[in-house]
């Protein structure tokens, strides 16, 4: 069974990194309403687009999602 996207993303946290995945991980870590228990691309993508308390480049999110699927 695949880890939730949130669980995988938390393994990518690195406050000293300028990599998009590390930046997103740190932003999501501080967002208390991020959907933590899902691996549904549409749900997470819509959340980032419409509800997140931060803005993030969705093109970069798509690339991060591909990395998530590869692990």
Curated annotation (Swiss-Prot):
Transmembrane segments: none annotated. Pfam families: YozE_SAM_like (PF06855). Belongs to the UPF0346 family. This is UPF0346 protein SPy_0467/M5005_Spy0383.
């Amino acid at each position: 069974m695949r880890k939730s996207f949130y669980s995988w993303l938390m393994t990518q946290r690195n406050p000293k990194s300028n990599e998009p995945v590390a930046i997103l991980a740190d932003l999501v870590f501080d967002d208390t309403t991020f959907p933590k228990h899902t691996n549904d691309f549409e749900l997470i993508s819509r959340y980032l687009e419409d509800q997140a308390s931060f803005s993030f480049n969705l093109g970069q999110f798509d690339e991060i999602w591909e990395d998530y699927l590869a692990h």
